[in-house]
Amino acid sequence: MAAPLVPLSQQIPGGNPLYESYYKQVDPAYTGRVGASEAALFLKKSGLSDIILGKIWDLADPEGKGFLDKQGFYVALRLVACAQSGHEVTLSSLSLTMPPPKFHDTSSPLMATQSSAETHWAVRVEEKAKFDGIFESLLPVNGLLSGDKVKPVLMNSKLPLDVLGRVWDLSDIDKDGHLDRDEFAVAMHLVYRALEKEPVPSILPPPLIPPSKRKKTVFAGAVPVLPASPPPKDSLRSTPSHGSVSSLNSTGSLSPKHSVKQPPVAWVVPVADKMRFDEIFLKTDLDLDGYVSGQEVKEIFMHSGLTQNLLAHIWALADTRQTGKLSKEQFALAMYFIQQKVSKGIDPPQVLSPDMVPPSERGTPIPDSSSTLASGEFTGVKELDDISQEIAQLQREKYSLEQDIREKEEAIRQKTSEVQELQNDLDRETSSLQELEAQKQDAQDRLDEMDQQKAKLRDMLSDVRQKCQDETQTISSLKTQIQSQESDLKSQEDDLNRAKSELNRLQQEETQLEQSIQAGRAQLETILRSLKCTQDDINQARSKLSQLQESHLEAHRSLEQYDQVPDGVSGTSLPDLATLNEGILLAERGGFGAMDDPFKNKALLFSNNSQELHPDPFQAEDPFKSDPFKGADPFKGDPFQSDPFSEQQTAATDPFGGDPFKESDPFHSSSSDDFFKKQTKNDPFTSDPFTKNPSLPSKLDPFESSDPFSSSSISSKGSDPFGTLDPFGSSSFSSAEGFADFSQMSKPPPSGPFSSSLGGTGFSDDPFKSKQDTPALPPKKPAPPRPKPPSGQSTPVSQLGSSDFPESPDPFQPLGADSGDPFQNKKGFGDPFSGKDPFAPSSSAKPPKTSSSGFADFTSFGNEEQQLAWAKRESEKAEQERLARLRRQEQEDLELAIALSKADMPA
């Protein structure tokens, strides 16, 4: 495909007018470019298949530009000629000699002279794409837009209504009341031209007719169309009569004597066209009977684009024998008339001229009646004259009848046209009916779809209603809950208000109590001050009392002096004791009178009664007779007599109104009791609440008694199992000294540390065993013997002398079957260590008491070299085992990795 093209000078003869005319048809403006759509539309007229045309396009446009220049178009024409001549479609075939290409009727001079502007659509490709977008946006139905949908688009142009109406009439080419995609593009093109101040044509010019709406000429391989019903036979039969009448009228002036045989006239159908029409006839004559019917040529005739009335007239002209079928010459004549109308616009004649009659149907000319009449004039026979007159009469009648026939034929022709128009109307109505049925089907489909949507909406509505009911119920329940919560909240608020009021009341009471306490504290301070003053007075009284006692002692000494007076001395020589001590006693008494002197009574002074020597100095008179607090007692009332938190209404009363001490004066003293020695029963300071009350029995300390694990028999060092011998006291291990003797496990224990203290009541019975006897478990299997060390001969432990293991009291000897054994019960489990020593020798002989049986022989390891050899072997063996374990571990890791990789691989 990329091979270099052969120069045009070698491909196409210079100045070929046929190629120039073809190029002018596809590029009338000589732009030098032929678009793909124009080239494809033109090349399809060659009758070649799409595959061959695609190959021709690839060879003509090797660079893939999407269009053809003049040289490429010439190459395409040359390749079309190669394909039509039977040559291979390649670039090497361009140099071959071949006939020019044929593009249906374009090879005819008539088609060659046709205006090239008619083969191109004036709507450009980019405009068509834009108009197609607008067309799709209007939502066409079955590819058509109604006037209601197109009207808003046209009205947006602001053009006059008469111009828009003319645009609609011009664009609706098939007059179906709808616009398809191409017709809509024509309408939009006219609107844009009108907006550019171009006049709207009254008739749609051929360049604006879409390619799909253009009337095609009949060409080889095409499939034209013919009317469904052939013209009536009456009209078809009447056609030759016109010719006969015309011929009669035209030849009536001829003299019968001068009737001359006309020379043969050439047929109007050219020979080249006759050959081409014969090819079409052979393709159309499927039954090969030499005739084609109206159904067989219907599509060929309709493909020309002519009206059905005109095609019916052409059929009537061609069917000269009125057989309803066309022979080969008649078919060629009909195709000639169609070609003349399509290419030149020449209407077919009303009657066939002599040159139009097929050559095979040309016969002897019709004999002229006038010649017969003239010949009868020269006969001279009367009968012949009568016959001539009769013939003339008949001719006149015939003429009148022919006139009637022509009138009736004209009426029939009119009726036929009316019928044809009605048939056309019927066809249009049928097509409209089909469209309406299609619309009805669409409407029914839409109705069904809407019914389905309606059913879905009903289901959705029912669901929504159900949801609404559920939500309504939920809302009602929530409202009920809200109401209940509101009532609860209201009650709680009431409770809160009551609690607040109660709190306020309590706070007020607390404030009052605090005030009362403060007042009580103030009174208490006053009382304390008074008490302090009273205490000071008491102290002064005590000091005076001490002075009195000293005076008493002094008086006593004076009495002793009296007693020591000798008998010979006269009593008068001694001074009076009262007079002697009066001044001193007065000073000591602080101004006491003689009547108040406690030492005035001599009987009492010299009495030997000890009780009478110490009378109460305050017996005669109460020193605290006057109570300083008697007027206003601060403790007159009990401040805690009423509950301040009770529900009773609080009264503003004095919290200290009641005197707790009103019944008895705390400072009152009787004449017989000392105020400072007698204690009040209710004195809160008489006893210390934290001192130990000797009257209460003291608690017994559970740990105050003897140690539960102590032994009453442990009173001497000799009974201590660890007192005589340290089991680890020996610093040398050369002998068995200091080790427990396990050979005495079966012997009954001596009086151990627990035997005396616990006796038979300590652990003689298992505290955790059941009351019933438990069946004894089967005896445990003895442990396997310890393997002998890998060394030479050694002396067993059982053969050691007694000097090696001296006998000593065993602090760990087994507690045998003694009743005092806390760990062994005849009815319970046996001692787990009372069995055979696993380290003892296998000999059944009872070892002597001095032997140290039960220990492994550690001297059997041999000398140092043997021990080193044994250690080496053991280390090598351990190393081999370690390496074997490593190898096994590596193998297991490898197998695990392989298994994991297989598991991760996709199936």
Swiss-Prot record:
Biological process terms in GO annotation: synaptic vesicle endocytosis
Quaternary structure and partners: Interacts with EPS15, AGFG1/HRB and AGFG2/HRBL. Associates with the clathrin-associated adapter protein complex 2 (AP-2). Interacts with FCHO1. Interacts with FCHO2. Interacts (via EH domains) with DAB2. Interacts with UBQLN1 (via ubiquitin-like domain). Interacts with CAVIN3 (via leucine-zipper domain). Interacts with REPS2.
GO MF annotation terms: calcium ion binding
Organism in which the protein naturally occurs: Mus musculus
Chain intervals with Basic and acidic residues compositional bias: 622-636
Domain named EF-hand: residues: 48-83, 159-194, 272-307, 308-341
Name the record gives this protein: Epidermal growth factor receptor substrate 15-like 1
Phosphotyrosine sites (modified residues): 74, 562
Residues with Phosphoserine modification: 107-108, 229, 244, 253, 255, 259, 360, 369, 375, 558, 610, 664, 670, 695, 715, 732, 791
SMART domains noted in UniProt: EFh (SM00054), EH (SM00027)
Segments of this protein annotated with the region Disordered: 229-260, 611-860
Domain of life of the native organism: Eukaryota
Location of the region described as Interaction with DAB2 in the Swiss-Prot/TrEMBL record: 15-368
Modification after translation: Phosphorylated on tyrosine residues by EGFR.
EH domain residues: 15-104, 127-215, 273-363
